[in-house]
């Protein structure tokens, strides 16, 4: 039959055909996706529920003028299954994958809240940083040369060649926001700040280096899009979703993206409500280091993991990369194609423009920063310096 796009009606029939519901069951189906690339259907018969996710052959945010391979759905399904090998508590269960229709049937997580929405609404997730720190440590370690035999790693790397979505990252994170490109999207009040950013040669040279790292450093399996909209949370649970951008890349990429999105939320808050975001930034790194170190000592398969001086160098390199990648993400989410609600939904225009200017300023500081040590307090320090300088609307 070949590929076809599901509707709410055909999604129900698909689920019945594959035995998820009885043929006579009264199944309620709603398309609930708010992302840029896929359809997401929730199906519920009153007793059980599932999620059907289907990749579209184009970017939904743009339309059919931006074609994409539906093979990314297979990559997403494989990534979730690999994550589940190491951290099953932190990902949804994958029930099945249909490669021809680019459909993945997964656990319904509607008992939880998308973390971005929860943070905007002022919800608190005390275990978020512990869970994400441990998720990152396990996945990044076990799919790298440190936790996986080199021949196995090369084979695994080959299954995550993801050209379409890597090209999106290359363009939308590292290229377009730093020059005159049609994909950029920002308010006219930011034009002077944007012009200054685009003319900053030192900044562009640093961004070029971070882009080159993303292009060439195939160090470990990365989620590739680990922002707070790709995580479900409750006070006791955390689930990472949507790894369709998964590929082999730099250790620091996912860490930097996650931290950047916490910083964006902090910029949207009043000063007295920001401390919880810095708690999560600092704890994410500390749990990552603690867990990664234990795995390195106890599970390392690469010969030089026995050299005590090697681990601190690796952690410093990861931290340095995370800082720069976080800076790129801050700028991309402020003036690039895909914004975040944390900033865009600030109702007061003056406050919103001020927060966006501060995001751009902080992004530049992080990209240019030459870190000499893996001091996680750096994010709090540069944030406070940026805000106190009085970047005004």
Swiss-Prot record:
Cystine residue pairs: none
Q: Which InterPro entries match?
A: Aminoglycoside_PTrfase, Kinase-like_dom_sf, Methylthioribose_kinase
Q: Where does substrate bind?
A: 225, 332
Entry's Pfam families?
Answer: APH
Keywords in alphabetical order, please: Amino-acid biosynthesis, ATP-binding, Kinase, Methionine biosynthesis, Nucleotide-binding, Transferase
Q: Which reaction does it catalyse?
A: 5-(methylsulfanyl)-D-ribose + ATP = 5-(methylsulfanyl)-alpha-D-ribose 1-phosphate + ADP + H(+)
| Example GO BP | L-methionine salvage from methylthioadenosine
Indicate the transmembrane segments per the record: none
Give the Enzyme Commission number.
2.7.1.100
- Pathway(s) this gene product operates in, as recorded in its UniProt entry: Amino-acid biosynthesis; L-methionine biosynthesis via salvage pathway; S-methyl-5-thio-alpha-D-ribose 1-phosphate from S-methyl-5'-thioadenosine (hydrolase route): step 2/2
Q: What does this protein do?
A: Catalyzes the phosphorylation of methylthioribose into methylthioribose-1-phosphate.
**Family membership noted in the UniProt record:** Belongs to the methylthioribose kinase family.
**UniProt cross-references to PANTHER family, sorted A to Z:** METHYLTHIORIBOSE KINASE (PTHR34273:SF2)
Which NCBIfam families does the record match to this protein? Answer: MTRK
Q: Which named protein is this?
A: Methylthioribose kinase
What are the top taxonomic ranks of the organism?
A: Bacteria, Bacillati, Bacillota, Bacilli, Bacillales
């Amino acid at each position: 039959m070949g590929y076809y796009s599901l509707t709410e009606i055909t999604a129900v029939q698909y689920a019945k055909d594959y035995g998820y519901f009885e043929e006579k069951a009264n199944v309620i189906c709603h398309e609930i996706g708010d992302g840029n690339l896929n359809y997401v259907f929730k199906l519920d018969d009153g007793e059980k529920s599932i999620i059907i996710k289907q990749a579209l052959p184009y970017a939904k945010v743009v339309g059919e003028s931006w074609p994409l391979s539906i093979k990314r759905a297979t990559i997403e399904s494989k990534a979730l299954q690999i994550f589940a090998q190491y951290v099953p508590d932190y990902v949804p269960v994958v029930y099945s994958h249909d490669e021809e229709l680019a459909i993945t049937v997964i656990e319904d997580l509607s008992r939880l809240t998308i973390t971005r929405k929860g943070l905007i609404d002022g919800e608190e997730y005390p275990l978020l940083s512990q869970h994400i720190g441990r998720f990152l440590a396990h996945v990044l370690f076990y799919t790298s040369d440190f936790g996986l035999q080199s021949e196995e790693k090369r084979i695994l790397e080959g299954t995550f060649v993801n050209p379409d979505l890597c090209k999106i990252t290359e363009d939308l994170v590292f290229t377009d926001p730093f020059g005159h490109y049609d994909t950029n999207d920002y308010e006219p009040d930011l034009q002077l700040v944007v012009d200054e950013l685009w003319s900053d040669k030192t900044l562009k040279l640093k961004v070029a280096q971070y882009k080159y790292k993303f292009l060439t450093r195939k160090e470990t399996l990365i989620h590739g899009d680990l922002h707070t909209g790709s995580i479900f949370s409750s006070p006791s649970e955390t689930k990472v979703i949507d790894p369709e951008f998964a590929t082999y890349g730099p250790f620091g990429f996912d860490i930097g993206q996650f931290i950047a999105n916490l910083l964006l939320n902090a910029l949207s808050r009043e000063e007295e409500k920001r401390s919880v975001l810095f708690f999560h930034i600092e704890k994410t790194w500390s749990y990552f280091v603690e867990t990664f170190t234990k795995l390195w000592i106890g599970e390392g398969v690469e010969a030089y993991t026995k050299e005590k001086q090697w681990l601190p160098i690796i952690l410093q390199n990861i931290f340095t990369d995370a800082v720069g990648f976080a800076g790129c993400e801050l700028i991309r989410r402020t003036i690039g194609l895909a914004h975040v609600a944390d900033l865009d939904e600030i109702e007061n225009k003056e406050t919103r423009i001020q927060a966006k200017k501060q995001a751009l300023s902080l992004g530049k500081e992080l990209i240019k920063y030459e870190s000499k040590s893996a001091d996680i307090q750096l994010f709090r320090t540069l944030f406070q310096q940026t805000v106190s300088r009085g970047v005004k609307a």
